Amino acid sequence: MATVLITGTSKGIGLHTALAFARAGHKVLATMRNPARAQELAERASAEKLPILISAMDVDSDHSVRDGMTTIEKEHGAIDILVNNAGVEASGSIEELPLETFRSVMETNYFGALRCMKAILPQMRQRRSGCIINISSVAGKISSAPLSPYMASKWALEAVSEALAGEMKTFNVRVAIVEPGIIDTSMARRIEDPGAVSPYRQKTRFSHLFVASLKNPVSPSVVAEKILEIAEGDIWTLRHPVGPDAAPFLQWRAQFTDEEWVNLNAGDDDAWYARVERDFGLDTRPKSTAA
């Protein structure tokens, strides 16, 4: 049995990951910014009599992470597995979004994960044992409007995770990156709504891609099972695309030169919708204009 700390467990991937590890017999320390939002997790853990302990930890706060880690280690011993799942999204054009939005997303998605890793690395290094799993996204390998704040944060997380993997392999600590595609979470469904009218057509187009993909939703439990598999597995691999569209999205981007990719995303709506339909079999056109 391992002791597992998971951030961002109030819903979605984090909640399902907490349940998956607990069902597998591990002790789960489920953290979130506001434990008042833990009702679903608490009820499911209680109903199944699962070893899940819920506590407050705000990954945006040095004080919260430091004190949380100290308390956990005193009460539960060393942490064997860290799953950095806490994350937020924001969509919009770079011109229209306030700078504070970029800072806020980066604070949670990148610095939040980094903060937790730095807090736990000394004990893992000294014990020469441990596993860190960072939840990124296919967005960590693809960049396109209108998700620049989110994508920038995931690119940063991918970079620091790859660097950390090289540093910690010497100490027998595994680092892995999970790259989900479009998963049925509240975060994904928020991106469905293009919101206010914008001169940037990409904002509306991307929302329609999410609408089309979520017609056949992929449960967060699929990602949770992959995270558990990585943690319990003997064979180490750095990156793990998850979900039926994850690898295809990455392969789609890889087939374009940088200039071709920019031109596609800067092009007119008809060309963009046609290319997505050709390559993915998805009609992402808005219903009012679909053929």
Name every feature range the model reports, one short phrase each:
Residues 24-40:
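Conserved glycine-rich Rossmann-like NAD(P)H-binding loop of the short-chain dehydrogenase/reductase
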Residues 56-67, 99:
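The beta1-alpha1 cofactor-binding region of Rossmann-like NAD(H)/NADP(H)-dependent oxidoreductases
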Residues 137:
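Residue(s) in the substrate-gating loop at a strand-loop-helix junction
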Residues 170-237:
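SDR active-site lid
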